[in-house]
Amino acid sequence: MFHQVWAALLSLYGLLFNSMNQCPEHSQLTALGMDDTETPEPHLGLWYFIAGAASTTEELATFDPVDNIVFNMAAGSAPRQLQLRATIRTKSGVCVPRKWTYRLTEGKGNMELRTEGRPDMKTDLFSSSCPGGIMLKETGQGYQRFLLYNRSPHPPEKCVEEFQSLTSCLDFKAFLVTPRNQEACPLSSK
């Protein structure tokens, strides 16, 4: 009798614990797909880097000196090519321009980007529950991180909280939010 009561109490405790510690299902991480007839048009234009998550702080260290980053995604000169230009505003106020070329590759129905000149780097795009938001999962040599971008430089705080909650459930415990205290640097046209 004692064992049955004890088992019932443990089961009740387990149910209560699980109901309070709910992580979203992995299926809530929705990959953005694109087939050969579609264009990446919904993803073109300006994006602001908001936050990042990784397993370790070292995987986010590249963003430590950053105040804000603004990106412009444009169609490339070749099919299935994207041009990404960015301007990084460091915490010390310096503007650092960057540019990358991405190739859209076949990735099991999801939109997978490969960075030219970086064969080890893969980027997957995921939808975000945040209006105007998108999540990227970057995988490279020795790192894996999720990055949150938004069309607005200052999305609702709830967006950042949901991103942190989701990535924490995926065991990405290191978290970084860009301060975005300074004005974004102008994007160069080159």
Swiss-Prot record:
SS bond list: C23-C169, C95-C185, C130-C159
Name the UniProt record assigns to this protein: Apolipoprotein M
Family: Belongs to the calycin superfamily. Lipocalin family. Highly divergent.
Alphabetized GO MF terms: antioxidant activity; lipid transporter activity; phospholipid binding
Main localisation: secreted
Gene Ontology BP annotations: cholesterol efflux; high-density lipoprotein particle assembly; high-density lipoprotein particle clearance; high-density lipoprotein particle remodeling; lipoprotein metabolic process; negative regulation of plasma lipoprotein oxidation; reverse cholesterol transport
Species assigned in the record: Mus musculus
Pfam families reported in the protein's UniProt record: ApoM
Function, as annotated: Probably involved in lipid transport. Can bind sphingosine-1-phosphate, myristic acid, palmitic acid and stearic acid, retinol, all-trans-retinoic acid and 9-cis-retinoic acid.
Statement: the UniProt record of this protein carries the keyword Signal: yes
Expression sites (tissue/organ): Expressed by the liver; secreted in plasma.
Residues annotated as signal peptide: 1-22
Quaternary structure, from the entry: Interacts with LRP2; LRP2 mediates APOM renal uptake and subsequent lysosomal degradation.
Gene name for this UniProt entry: Apom
Keywords: Disulfide bond, HDL, Lipid transport, Secreted, Signal, Transport
Location relative to the cell: Secreted
Binding site for tetradecanoate: E138, R145
GO cellular component: discoidal high-density lipoprotein particle; extracellular region; high-density lipoprotein particle; low-density lipoprotein particle; spherical high-density lipoprotein particle; very-low-density lipoprotein particle
